[in-house]
């Protein structure tokens, strides 16, 4: 299986906008867990899965619309009785899914080149996305890669207090978290060498 970030880098090199759907949180019985990802291309090609079924189809449809608008969204899905009826689903939990649109540009491609190199070297880091707008509505993001030694690839989007928190290993999970720092919102994703589709 090709590592996820290698696949994202390949998609960035194609220069067409695409989306990455990531399960940020899950509660109860769900087909996949937090951190599961799926790349969605404009032609509806997918790489990876967030669990299949109706939720995956709904996420794909939402991603298509978001790609056209160059906007991202965080949305909750409930695998309740209404959604499950007639679908032979046994899950009954809730998912919060980040549907993030990637619009290729040299800076973003450079960040993912550095990230892929980091993973090949077996090192850790943090992919930080600053939300432009508010997470309760559609938004866009700007990214940078942060290493534990405070080296940054990309724009320096992070205020020093947040940089200190990141580098003090306060974010040790395996999936992205939405983090409020004052009035600004960030998505902080710990990077581990084993991230795959």
Q: Which ranges hold each PLM region?
A:
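Segments forming oxygen-rich coordination pockets for charged ligands
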Residues: 1-197
């Amino acid at each position: 299986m090709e590592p996820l970030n290698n696949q994202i880098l390949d998609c960035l090199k194609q220069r067409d906008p695409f989306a990455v759907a990531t399960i940020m949180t899950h509660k109860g019985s769900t087909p996949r867990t937090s951190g599961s990802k799926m790349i969605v291309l404009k032609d509806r090609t997918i790489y990876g899965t967030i669990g299949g079924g109706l939720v995956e189809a709904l996420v794909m449809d939402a991603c298509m619309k978001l790609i056209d608008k160059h906007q991202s969204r965080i949305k909750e899905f409930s695998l309740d009785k209404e959604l499950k009826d007639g679908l032979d689903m046994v899950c009954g939990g809730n998912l919060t899914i980040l549907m993030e649109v990637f619009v290729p540009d040299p800076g973003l491609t450079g960040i993912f080149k550095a990230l892929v190199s980091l993973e090949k070297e077996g090192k850790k880091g943090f992919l930080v996305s600053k939300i432009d707008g508010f997470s309760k509505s559609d938004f866009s993001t700007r990214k940078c890669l942060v290493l534990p030694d405070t080296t940054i690839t990309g724009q320096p989007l992070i205020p020093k207090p947040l940089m200190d928190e990141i580098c003090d290993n306060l974010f040790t999970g395996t999936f992205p978290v939405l983090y409020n720092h004052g009035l600004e919102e960030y998505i902080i994703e710990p990077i581990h060498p084993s991230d795959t589709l």
